[in-house]
């Protein structure tokens, strides 16, 4: 249990450093780009799957 506490403490400290630094704005833009790429890839794979006759998405 103590290892989980230490792990979350480290993650929280890194998030705090990145959030209060100037990197947060750049991270948001990168996350937006990755999100839209993932949505486009999902839609392409769904259309290709439906075109092949598979019903699972």
From Swiss-Prot:
InterPro entries: DUF1328. Disulfide bonds: none annotated. GO terms for cellular component: plasma membrane. It is a multi-pass membrane protein. The chain crosses the membrane at residues 4-24, 30-50. It is found in: Cell membrane. Keywords: Cell membrane, Membrane, Transmembrane, Transmembrane helix. Its main location: membrane. Belongs to the UPF0391 family. This is UPF0391 membrane protein RPD_3366.
């Amino acid at each position: 249990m103590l290892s989980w506490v230490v792990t979350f403490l480290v993650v929280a400290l890194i998030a705090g450093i990145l959030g209060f630094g100037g990197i947060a704005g750049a991270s948001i833009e990168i996350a937006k780009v990755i999100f839209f790429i993932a949505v486009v890839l999902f839609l392409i794979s769904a259309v290709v799957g439906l075109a092949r006759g598979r019903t699972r998405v």
